[in-house]
Amino acid sequence: MPSPRIRKMSLSRALDKYLKTVSVHKKGHQQEFYRSNVIKRYPIALRNMDEITTVDIATYRDVRLAEINPRTGKPITGNTVRLELALLSSLFNIARVEWGTCRTNPVELVRKPKVSSGRDRRLTSSEERRLSRYFREKNLMLYVIFHLALETAMRQGEILALRWEHIDLRHGVAHLPETKNGHSRDVPLSRRARNFLQMMPVNLHGNVFDYTASGFKNAWRIATQRLRIEDLHFHDLRHEAISRFFELGSLNVMEIAAISGHRSMNMLKRYTHLRAWQLVSKLDARRRQTQKVAAWFVPYPAHITTINEENGQKAHRIEIGDFDNLHVTATTKEEAVHRASEVLLRTLAIAAQKGERVPSPGALPVNDPDYIMICPLNPGSTPL
């Protein structure tokens, strides 16, 4: 029996058809749309599907891996190319069986770029403060989304898809009926997470946030560019949140997986070094409780300036930059240091009482007389 006749269709047309009939029903439709547009920029897109060989696919792979991402100035990652090849492979399988535009899948036999070990980008205290301040001043919705990501480890798509009818603020649970891995999930909401959500107009039903995926992506890009924060993806906040869960030392791996939605424990192995670091304090059983408490109350760098008050007299202003709006003013430098120490002590004590995270002390600029260390426990020892 003769083989069915091949229908001629260019790869570009096939990608369009795939997007309209197959990809549109997937959760990752938007991402496949972007990848399809990338592929269509290359000569391979003009070839008919039945004419494309493994050599053509390998050439496309190598060309992409040799290119520089104009947005980041870095080489295109292997993960990016691997996902583009996965799209092509899915397309060829559909076309071979259902459309009759090719007889083989040339992508299957081509070597794929290795899967990277994953990004390990941590959000610094300075970046967190700057982004928080920027979003609070510019857009309340972005402010809530940013902090909700850090409190819950939810993915961008999960946050943007939140609906009020799925949020129980009384019991502190957000229900995600559909997630990336195809399973529903209940996300525990900390007190801080609930407080952030309540900044939004609370309704009985409907979307919590109005952003589309592309709109939010653009807003995030603009914010990081204006603040000159390099190489920080929104998805890095999920990594940051999970890292903080491990650093708490009070949650086991299974509990963290239940919060984050990881179906495979292998995905959480990259965080085990954080767990080991936390176990040091538990192994040191002889450490006194006072030492644990004192660990909260460490010195912080502060900037001291001389200002002119309205009455014409000079005053001294001290600002502790690791905290938002933590500053004092006094007529003498000694009094300013004493007040700054008291305010810092009160701030740290309240955070310790509530179990809230505080920023780590930043670096003290070398040989800069305008910077001093403020000690919350012993203001008299603070160098002037």
Curated annotation (Swiss-Prot):
Ranges of residues in domain Core-binding (CB): 9-96
Active site: R155, K180, H235, R238, H262, Y271
CDD domains: INT_Rci_Hp1_C (cd00796)
Residue ranges occupied by any Tyr recombinase domain in the UniProt entry: 118-284
GO biological process, one term: DNA recombination
GO MF assignments: DNA binding
Keywords: DNA integration, DNA recombination, DNA-binding, Plasmid
Family to which this protein belongs: Belongs to the 'phage' integrase family.
Function: Shufflon-specific DNA recombinase.
Stored PANTHER family: INTEGRASE_RECOMBINASE HI_1414-RELATED, PHAGE INTEGRASE-RELATED
Name assigned to this protein: Shufflon-specific DNA recombinase
Annotated organism of origin: Escherichia coli
Gene: rci
